[in-house]
Structure formats: structure tokens, C-alpha cells
UniProtKB/Swiss-Prot annotation:
NCBIfam families: PRK13531.1. Coiled coil: none annotated. GO terms for molecular function: ATP binding; ATP hydrolysis activity. Component of the RavA-ViaA chaperone complex, which may act on the membrane to optimize the function of some of the respiratory chains. RavA functions as an ATPase. This is Regulatory ATPase RavA.
Amino acid sequence: MAHPHLLAERISRLSSSLEKGLYERSHAIRLCLLAALSGESMFLLGPPGIAKSLIARRLKFAFQNARAFEYLMTRFSTPEEVFGPLSIQALKDEGRYERLTSGYLPEAEIVFLDEIWKAGPAILNTLLTAINERQFRNGAHVEKIPMRLLVAASNELPEADSSLEALYDRMLIRLWLDKVQDKANFRSMLTSQQDENDNPVPDALQVTDEEYERWQKEIGEITLPDHVFELIFMLRQQLDKLPDAPYVSDRRWKKAIRLLQASAFFSGRSAVAPVDLILLKDCLWYDAQSLNLIQQQIDVLMTGHAWQQQGMLTRLGAIVQRHLQLQQQQSDKTALTVIRLGGIFSRRQQYQLPVNVTASTLTLLLQKPLKLHDMEVVHISFERSALEQWLSKGGEIRGKLNGIGFAQKLNLEVDSAQHLVVRDVSLQGSTLALPGSSAESMPGKIKQQLEELESDWRKQHALFSEQQRCLFIPGDWLGRIEASLQDVGAQIRQAQQC
């Protein structure tokens, strides 16, 4: 076996060769190549004239001496046009019912069937056996067929509850294609002089029959780690809960796992990784509605769970909550406590400052910052005489926010613990304390928990960085995963600075 990374590099170069002269079809070519290398079938949905047949034709060049068969189905297509004509001589001389299959589907490695849903029952039934068992019954004999890739195409989906659903379920990968969108790509396509029938693949990159057969065995040896299985099961359970989710058969799940194994194998890995699960977005949908739903669910899985993003945020929330509780406890100990006076016959409770508070101007710290008068405030300066008068007689109280500017009117009160509390317009409060009696620095246990969480985040980010080198996954998905991990990291770092 070639070194895994050398194999991954070779498959990448092979795909690049196949993509030459095709615009905005890289993902389709790569998935077709993956399907061919793992012996799966795929369905291309899209309007006429968007290179569906050319994509299939190109895949022939991925293999040495591969034979291709393509056919446009109509309502009048007969099995003879797909599987070969009957041998008149065998029927006449020996009374044998036998087809001449040379040049037809039973002897082709790459098969492209356009307008597949127009095929009649006789063709569909034989095709199902060919896909399922890689066998073709030719008269009294059952022959193995060499088909590595079946690409079926149409500009429409099969009707629900029709006889076509069985065939549709066998097509593991489903791609919805559209016209070339980018202006530069459209211009390049119009002016390209490349012959579509030329072989763009160097001989050294083409896959031999021996390599193909060996790889089929090695793909099956790729492991499915427990944590990846848990993600798959989570997705399956979530889909089962959604009323509009498509039905996904156990057979489709099993075939999809082999595709994930192939993705890992041709990416140079010995085990399926969470990033491979993105391929399920092209395997589990049934129609336009379910296509969007499946993509949404896999996006949630990838950006919230695959690298423990949500789990780390939950842990962070618990740590921050505990830190806030400790800060509140500390605030209760260090807050400025005023003295309650007798005032039995007074209409309002009267207070005075502690005897050790003697400065003419008092700077009191907010235990947590508040936005007051459109300013983020961390401390307030009071004239001692004004504060004493307010404690004794009530009324209006003013203070300089952050010690600057004019004194502003404040919503100040004394709570049940005899602490001064200032409130913002939404009535959120912050206890006031004298300088030097503010909350202590972050407790060691909280700091340690945040450091452990940051270490776990770095491990998950390193795992993603290592696994994201996957030819078959679009870059925009990788970008969203990276952004989700960076968001978690930023929140952890912010908590460490509090």
C-alpha cells in the first residue's frame, strides 16, 4: 500500500486533471470520483446543457482502459438498447436466450443514463439488480459486471410513491447542479477551445484494476470511532424528531458509512473523522425541501457538536456562573456598609456613613460596570456632604461618573444589607465599594478551570486543522467550522480577562 499521504496527493492531482476545462463543477467531479473509487452510484439533478454527461464521460479517464456506456432514456427505450440485443444466432441454433453485451452497460466500468425516470419497468428491474449485486442475468447465466460508477441524471425528481423510488434509493450521492454563475467562469467557458473528448489525465495518475480491487478491501478497514458514531446517531435521532425530515433507510445509512470510510481513506486517514460527515448532506436528502433541512441539521452538527463547541460553551457558562457567584459573595463582604439610625418616628429610614470614612470626596467602585447616561461606568465620585445629606434626608443624589465631567443624577438606594446600590435605566444594580475593598482577583480554581478549558479548545482546534485536509469537502463548510471554533476560543479568552 502506498503511503497514505502520497495516495491522498495522487487522488488530489487526479481530481485536478479531471476538472480541467469544467467550470464550477469541481465539487461534482470530486464526488463522482469518490463514488467511482468506492463503487457507488450517484444522481445529478439539473436543467439540460450543464455538463452532466461530460462529468460522467470524464470519469472514464480516471481508470486505465475503462469502458464507458451512456444512453438517453425515452419512454420508448427497450432493454436491448441498454443491455444489448438478443443473439439471433444463439436463439436460432441453440434455442438460448442470450444478449450480445459488448459495448453495452453489462461490460462498462462507467455508466451514464440520462433522463433516467423515463425508463420502463423492464429496464428498471434489471438495473436494480445490476446496482445491488453487480450482476447481470444473461439467459441462463449470471454474469458479474465491472460497473464502478453509475451516474443517472434528470431535470426532475421521481414522483413520490412511484415505482421509481426503489431505484432512487440506490443512488447514494445526489447533487443539484445549476448553470455557471460566475462572470469570469462563464466567459472562460464560452471561449474555451478544449476538446471534450481529450484525455486530461496523465497515465501515471490513472487507477489500475489491481489498485481498484485492493482499495475496495482497504476502504472496509477504515475504522468508525465511537465519537463519530455518536455524531451520526445524534443526526439520525434529530431527523427522526422532525416532521418534514426525509425517510432515510437503514440501507442508505450503511452505504453512506462506506462513503465516509472512502473519504477518510483517500484523504490519508485510518479512521473516519467528523469532517467526513459533511458528505451526508449529499446523501440524505430527497427533494428541495429536505435538501435545505438536511444541510441545516448538518450545519448545526458541524458548528455545534462535532468538535465539542457546544459542550465547551456549556462548560464555560458554568465556570462563568460560578465566578459570578464568588464575585457576588465577595461583593457582599467588601461593599460599603452604611449605618442605620434609630428614626422610629421618621417617615423614612435614616443612615450615616461609617466613622472611618472621612474624606471630603468619596470615590466608590462599582462591583460590576453599568451603563449610566450613555457611559460605561466603573466608579462614581460623590461629595461627602451631599451623600450624607441624601442618607439622612433622601431626595436627589448626584455623582461624577468615572470621576469626570459634571455630577449626574443617579438612581441610588440602600438595600436590605445596608449596602449602597446604583441602578441603570433597566434597574440592573451594582453594589458600591470603597477603593481597596473591591473584589479580589480571579480565584485560583476558576483560573485553573478556564486554563483546562482553553487547553481542550486548543486540542479540538488542532484536530480540526489536521482533519480538514479533505478533498471532498467544500471550503465554505470548513470556513464555518473554523469560525465556530474561533468564536468559542474568543469567549474563553474573554472570560479569562474578567
